């Protein structure tokens, strides 16, 4: 199974469109709050699966707890991929996309980490964010952010959130 994680939208039309987009290539869109259940279910039944997480989004206010430099700006980054990978010791694979010609793209699977529990807390998130930045710099025209990626400043985080859990 191939799962794509998504945040359900309040607007039914927009939500349906997002689910349709995330359903391409036989993917199964899973609301973000259900992903752990899906992972446990698939592991228990011995099924192979791939779960797709989008790492270029900005965390919500309650999750401003890990910051690093991203595209030359102090940026809060999501840590969910690392938390889930470490909890279940799942390998993390990144996707690198390139345009072949109009409407045609190729995707390479890049092994980021096969044993996340062997890393220090926060290291996988740093590796993932650096790789994402490298991919963006290689082909910036393939990236479109329809949200405000840098809408938060570090002062937004409560007391800098335990002084940035996992920060060195």
What are these regions, as identified by a protein language model?
Residues 1-49:
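Conserved nucleotide-cofactor-binding alpha/beta core module
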Residues 24, 33-168:
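Non-catalytic C-terminal accessory region of glycerolipid acyltransferases
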């Amino acid at each position: 199974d191939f799962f794509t994680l998504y945040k359900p939208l309040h607007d039914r039309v927009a939500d349906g469109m997002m689910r349709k987009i995330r359903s391409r290539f036989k993917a199964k869109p899973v609301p973000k709050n259900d992903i752990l259940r899906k992972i446990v279910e698939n592991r228990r039944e011995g099924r192979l699966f791939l779960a797709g997480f989008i790492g270029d989004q900005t965390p919500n206010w309650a999750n401003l707890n890990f910051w690093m430099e991203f595209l030359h700006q102090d940026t809060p980054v999501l840590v969910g991929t690392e938390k889930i990978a470490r909890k279940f010791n799942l390998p993390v694979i990144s996707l690198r996309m390139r345009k072949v010609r109009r409407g045609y793209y190729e995707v390479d699977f890049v092994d980021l980490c096969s044993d996340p529990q062997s890393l220090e807390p926060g290291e996988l998130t740093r590796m993932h964010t650096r790789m994402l930045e490298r991919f963006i710099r290689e082909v910036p025209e393939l990236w479109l952010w329809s949200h405000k990626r840098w809408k938060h400043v570090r002062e937004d985080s409560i007391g800098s959130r335990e002084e940035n859990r996992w920060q060195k």
